[in-house]
Amino acid sequence: VNVQQGQPVPGARRTGPSRSGGVLALLLSALLILVTACGGSEDKKGGGTDPDKQPSQASVTITPKDGAKDVATDGALKVSSSRGRLTSVKVQDDKGNPVEGKVTGGSLWQPVGKLRAATTYKVDAVAVDDQLRESARHATFTTLVPENTFVGRYTPEDGQTVGVGMPVSINFTRGITDPERVQQGIKVTAEPSVPIAGRWFGNDRLDFRPEKYWKPGTKVTLDIDLKGVEGRPGVYGTQTKHISFTIGRSQVSTVDVRAKEMSVVRDGKKIKTIPVTAGGPGTETYNGQMVISEKHEVTRMNGETVGFGGEYDIADVPHAMRLSTSGTFIHGNYWSGRSTFGSRNASHGCIGLYDQRGGGDSSTPAAWFYANSLIGDVVTVKNSHDETIAPENGLNVWNMSWEKWRSGR
């Protein structure tokens, strides 16, 4: 009988498989198992599992360990990789501010500066091995809480309206040995925007000013973020402040010592001329641009506090406004005869304006000038035989050129 493949055999029953068919099925099954087994063996010889699914040989180590407390702010943070190279290291403080770092040799990351004290940091790092397989690590830690601290005492105050000559001046309660790090935590901006630069005087004072006097109406903002900043070894800042102040109208007064008079110019127009008495022989008034830093309706002036011994001690000097740290004021004077003003320089270096004792008479020149002056107004003195006042003697920053101011030297 001729049998074609796939055709039924004539006369054969279809109720079940034949004996020969069963044997054939068993043989085919055995062959399939053998082929499958051989195929599996060949796969192993060819490399087995996909290399991309193998774990990375690179390892990432973050120091300090996750959850660490009281971590030092300098030298403690390191991220390293063995059997691989670092491809990403991200460190942020609890405000989301990034920490700048540097990778050495592809396997060691360290911050370029010091961390802040009493601050929580988050670290995320990734490394790859020679097959570019990634390994990642995450950690958080908190830096130490300092025992020794400092703050900056600033002027002007928040919300104050001041004159066009007012700098931002910050005096620190401790001497600063890392001024660059501290200055990074302080920002002064203005609207409308102008270039503003800071300059240090000694190790405990930092002032900011624009190139020229502020324009009237300018809004100035001071942001201080010194929390955890190490200003000197083992001494950390604790301060976060946001203040703003406004520049009022422009008023610049000029005292001509030779002429013994003061011209008051507001918004470019002379509004008043006032006779004065300035420093006499041997106690001349400084020349230069001086900024009103304090106002006192009545104050005591004692010569012993400024090196004049017992030459004077006046308990009730009216309408006094400070122009220097060393003791220069522009103030009311009731003890000299009225004829002195405009005719003779007889003070110990201050600028005197005629006034009444107690300062109750609002019609006197001293009362008028006091009522019409702001902290931050400029009083310029010229034609005196004394030297120009130093920029750090008071808020008198305008006695330094912009080029020198910006140079920091």
Describe every region a protein language model picked out:
Residues 127-129, 226-228, 268, 298, ...:
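Short, charged beta-turn/beta-strand-edge "cap" motif at the junction between a beta-strand
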Residues 61, 78-80, 122, 169-171, ...:
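Soluble periplasmic/extracytoplasmic beta-strand elements of cell-envelope proteins
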Residues 164, 303-409:
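Exported/periplasmic cell-wall-interacting domains
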Residues 234-342:
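Gly/Pro-biased beta-strand-loop elements
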Residues 2-35, 39-249, 276:
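Acidic, low-complexity Ser/Thr/Gly/Pro-rich repeat segments typical of extracellular/periplasmic
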Residues 155, 251-259, 399-409:
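Short peripheral tails and domain-boundary helices/loops at the edges of structured domains
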